[in-house]
């Protein structure tokens, strides 16, 4: 029995020696992103693996808009509060604002660099380019909307409604009929983004703040005291200014944009602003039918809730398919951009390491999504195009 057992053991050892070795388990890593520890390094010379871990596909349809071989890139940093990007197809540059830094910048496409453009900028906030390539800007400090003509001159489009000074025009879009539509919340009616009211005004009830101190343009302060509720306005080329959405309908309007066919107007309602007596907006996005010079059929487009997190919207743009790309002011991991279909379905998002205020499509093909996020400018190459103009 002992000899037979030894022989059997030898056979088993031989069989084990001939058995193929098992393959070791695959070893894969987790690419750094905005939410890993350590987090992603956004400085130059630190490329991301493809597909970019901060470009998140929620619905398969998003893959047709967000290619797997493109990365989100930080183009520049150095702002205090970056806002209002708009693309000039004639000049091949992106203009954007540093609201609290009181400076406008240009990102030059060919040079791939950011340079100062206007300083002081009158705390310019939102910008756009009209159908003739002229820059439209909302000035928080002067509480007005202006247009820069091709000869370099400045035209004031609107600084009052029915003789009362505007609050602080915030975002602006042109219409093919030559009209200009803009929002007028109160966010620039404070010291860091523009100037507070004169003594006794809603944003300076005790009169302790001095609006003109240290302001290089104090002599042309517009809107001494807040006199109007928040609203959305339409300026007609004839010079007529109409209030098309009231504060009762939609408090604290902020970002706005048209659908590609100009049949729908989207408006963001953000939170309570300085001097507001009401509760402010709910940080939601609403849609309106455009009927000539008026709007109708107000409806909720999205409440901007994701995983129980309120992704507070600020600015937005539509692409040629009618998708809405909306900025997200939310905690890390949800800050960035959310993409919705025209039916209001969330299909994808882009995470950024900073809160995103506004965005615009640009580049020669108008396929680059530029994102103004707090102190930085980011860009991502898509496979769609922005609905022109910027």
Pin down the residues of each PLM region:
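Beta-propeller domains
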Residues: 89, 93-113
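Blade-level signature of beta-propeller repeat domains, shared across WD40, Kelch, NHL, RCC1
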Residues: 360-390
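Blade/loop signatures of beta-propeller domains
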Residues: 33-70, 389
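Short loop/turn segments immediately following beta-strands, especially the blade-tip
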Residues: 288-294, 382-387
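Blade-edge beta-strand/turn elements of extracellular beta-propeller
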Residues: 65-77, 113-120, 148-163, 231-250, ...
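A short loop-to-beta-strand structural motif that recurs across blades of beta-propeller domains
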Residues: 103-105, 144-146, 231-233, 284-286, ...
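N-terminal export signals
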Residues: 1-18
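Beta-rich, blade/repeat-based domains predominating
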Residues: 77-92, 120-139, 144, 162-182, ...
């Amino acid at each position: 029995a002992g000899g037979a057992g030894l022989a059997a053991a030898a056979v088993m050892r031989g069989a084990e020696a001939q058995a193929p070795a098992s393959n070791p388990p695959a070893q894969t890593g987790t690419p750094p992103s905005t939410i890993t520890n350590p987090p992603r390094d956004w400085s130059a010379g630190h490329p991301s693996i493809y597909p970019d871990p901060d470009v998140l596909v929620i619905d398969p349809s998003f893959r047709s808009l967000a290619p797997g071989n493109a990365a989100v890139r930080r183009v520049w940093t150095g702002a205090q509060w970056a806002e209002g990007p708009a693309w000039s197809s004639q000049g091949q540059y992106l203009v954007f604002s540093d609201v609290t830094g009181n400076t406008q910048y240009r990102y030059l496409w060919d040079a791939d660099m950011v340079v100062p453009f206007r300083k002081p900028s009158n705390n310019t906030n939102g910008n756009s380019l009209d159908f003739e390539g002229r820059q439209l800007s909302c000035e928080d400090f002067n509480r007005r909307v202006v247009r820069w003509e091709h000869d370099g001159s400045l035209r004031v489009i609107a600084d009052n409604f029915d003789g009362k000074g505007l609050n602080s025009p915030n975002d602006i879009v042109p219409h093919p009929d030559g009209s200009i539509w803009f929002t007028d919340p109160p966010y620039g009616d404070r010291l860091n983004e523009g100037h507070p009211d004169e003594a006794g005004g809603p944003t300076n009830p005790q009169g302790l703040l001095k609006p003109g101190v240290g302001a290089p343009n104090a002599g042309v302060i517009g809107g001494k005291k807040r006199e109007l509720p928040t609203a959305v306005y339409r300026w007609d080329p004839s010079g007529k200014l109409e209030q098309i959405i009231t504060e009762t309908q939609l408090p604290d309007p902020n970002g706005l944009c048209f659908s590609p066919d100009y049949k729908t107007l989207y408006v963001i309602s953000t939170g309570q602003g300085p001097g507001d007596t009401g509760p402010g907006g709910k940080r939601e996005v609403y849609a309106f039918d455009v009927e000539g010079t008026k709007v109708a059929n107000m409806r909720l487009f999205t409440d901007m809730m994701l995983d129980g997190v309120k992704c507070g919207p600020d600015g937005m743009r539509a692409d040629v398919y009618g998708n809405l790309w909306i900025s997200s002011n939310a905690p890390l991991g949800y800050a960035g951009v959310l993409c919705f279909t025209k039916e209001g379905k969330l299909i994808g998002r882009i995470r950024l390491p900073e809160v995103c205020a506004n965005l615009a499509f640009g580049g020669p093909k108008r396929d680059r999504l530029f994102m103004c996020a707090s102190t930085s400018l980011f860009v991502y190459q898509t496979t769609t195009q922005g609905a022109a103009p910027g």
